[in-house]
A protein has these predicted regions:
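A conserved acidic beta->alpha catalytic loop
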Residues: 20, 44-52, 68
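Acidic/His-rich active-site region of diverse nucleotide-sugar glycosyltransferases
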Residues: 74-77, 99, 104-186
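Short beta-strand/loop segment that forms part of the nucleotide-sugar
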Residues: 37-46, 64-66
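Non-catalytic, C-terminal membrane-associated alpha-helical segments of glycosyltransferases
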Residues: 235-240, 253-305
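Short beta-strand-to-loop acidic/aromatic patch adjacent to the donor-nucleotide binding site
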Residues: 88-99
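Glycine-rich, basic loop-to-helix element that forms the pyrophosphate-binding segment
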Residues: 66-86
Length: 305
């Protein structure tokens, strides 16, 4: 399927949740982009006076305040609907704790316009506090085990020599460019996830509809994960366990035996992560994983933590 067509009108959405300083930095980086944005939309998941004062009166910004915390998927969907209503050909999703260099968006657009079946593009993600450390060069996903990995995560590479557009299973939602045709084909982000794994789930659903996800390896973004929820907080561990299982159920290999293997493998992985995670007490971290596993088994989704 050839999905190439010019992406003339671009919109960017920044999601804020109790991180006004980060949000301002994200907005500033988008304003400086070489590639012009037709719409810059801020969705505030927890109405913040500082953000409102700085952005609500700015004629170049659409500031939207939600009545409650809708999570990453729900908050972004509020902005995506507005962007599509205004005629955007592609929508850039940007988490508040991410920033983009001036050339990032142009590289992402070029990757989508030059790749026959591409509908989603992401940059190389680097740590904002340690810029030589790579956080992700796209994701790999194994449907049999349900395991996912961020390519090259944790490696130190001051410069990334590859300039290719690489097909991957998914890209991080912290900076993700999605064409209008993808949204029209598969809908918006799945709000069952609320927080965590919604990006990979969206990419895998898009693949079923014939769209490829790519990493534009010449593009870079900087991200400091977990700023709004806590990098290794029990709540983050809860969502990681529950949503990993949910994704594996929806995008795993068929068969009862494979499903049982995936459940055991994913639970073991999340328990191991809780054991080595810094901060808080080990019993609290393990309870968070157990809670997430139990809620998955009980069919609890969304913001049911």
């Amino acid at each position: 399927m050839d999905t190439r067509h010019p992406l003339a009108r671009l919109a960017a959405i920044v999601l804020n949740y109790r991180t006004p300083a980060d949000t301002m930095a994200a907005v500033a980086s988008l304003r400086a982009s070489q590639r012009r944005l037709d719409h810059l939309i801020i969705v505030d998941n927890d109405p913040d006076d500082e953000c409102r004062r700085a952005l609500a009166g700015d004629p170049a910004v659409t500031y939207l305040s939600t009545a409650q915390n809708l999570g990453f998927s729900g908050g972004m969907n509020v902005g995506i609907r507005i962007a599509l209503e205004r005629g955007a050909d592609a929508v850039l999703l940007v988490n508040s704790d991410a920033t983009v260099p001036t050339d990032c968006i142009a590289f992402l657009v070029d990757a989508l316009e030059s790749t026959a079946d591409a509908g989603i593009a992401g940059p190389v993600i680097r740590s904002r506090s340690q810029p030589d450390r790579i956080a992700s060069v796209g994701m790999t996903y194994a449907p049999r085990s349900g395991r996912m990995r961020h390519r090259l995560a944790g490696t130190r590479q001051p410069s990334f020599e590859s300039r290719s557009v690489r097909r991957v299973d998914g890209v991080s939602g912290c900076v993700m460019l999605v064409t209008r045709r993808v949204f029209e084909s598969i809908g918006l982000l799945e709000e069952d996830y609320f927080y965590s794994f919604e990006d990979l789930a969206f990419c895998l659903t898009a693949r079923r509809a014939g769209f490829t996800t790519v990493v534009a390896e010449m593009a870079t973004a900087y991200h400091e994960g977990g700023r709004s929820i806590g990098a290794e907080s029990p709540r983050r561990l809860y969502f990681a366990a529950r949503n990993h299982l949910l994704l594996a159920t929806r995008h795993g290999s068929p068969g009862a035996l494979a499903a049982r293997w995936r459940l055991l493998s994913i639970v073991a992985l999340n328990v191991a992560h809780a054991v080595i995670a810094p901060g808080g007490s080990l019993p609290t971290r393990l309870r968070a994983v157990a809670h997430g596993t139990r809620d998955y088994l009980n069919g609890s989704h969304g913001n049911d933590a």
